Amino acid sequence: MDKKQQAFQFVDQHREEMVGLWREVVMLESGPHEKTGIDAVAARFGQVLAEAGAGIRSVEFEHAGNMLIAELGAERKKPGVIFLGHMDTAIAAGAATERPFVIRDGKVYGPGVLDMKGGIVAFLYAIKALNAAGYDSRPIKVLLAGDEEVLHAKSTAPDQLVAESQGYAAAFNAETGFLDNGIVVGRKGVARFTMEVSGVAAHAGNDPEN
């Protein structure tokens, strides 16, 4: 059995365990202003990654969900791969009680099952599957922000993401894809800039030379 088959076999053998973790984190309230719940999700994901052999770091924020950083195989020589995601949801407090995690007709429902706790659980188990298959080619880093839904308004997470990504070969985002199981290779983004301009104030039709 080759390494790819071993990895898929691991996933098949741990399917119920994956769903259990998915259920557990969905039932943790982690809406945009629920720092306690977001930090609880971070702690649980950190526990799973530590059990997989990753080194764990936490960037703590006073008024935003903490950021989780995990590294596996830092000694490997090739440029690494990043798994990127966020642990907060866009859903108000109380949703986990009102609309708890449920599987109905082969589909999973609940607050944050797609955006994006399900995606994070999937790549945590991808990492565990790679371990089980003996993968040792590239370092792997996991970067999980705690306040994406509020545009990191009260944290320095964007700066952390940029700094932690330097020198890596590729990044995979746990955001939801399309129903055809295709891979999304690009999305629109937003950047904000502050510009300072010096010169003489003038209308283009009045003294344009100056």
Place the predicted regions along the sequence by residue.
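Acidic/His- and Gly-rich active-site-bordering loop/insert found
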Residues: 2-111, 131-135
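Beta-strand secondary-structure signal
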Residues: 69, 141, 192-196
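Fold-independent oxyanion-binding glycine-rich loops
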Residues: 72, 85-87, 105, 145-147, ...
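Short glycine-aspartate micro-motif
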Residues: 80-82, 108, 169-173, 192-194
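Glycine/serine-rich anion-binding loops at beta->alpha junctions
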Residues: 107-121, 203
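Acidic/histidine-rich catalytic neighborhood of metal-dependent amide-processing enzymes
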Residues: 116-188
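Acidic-enriched catalytic cores of C-N bond-cleaving enzymes acting on peptides and small amides
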Residues: 185, 205-210
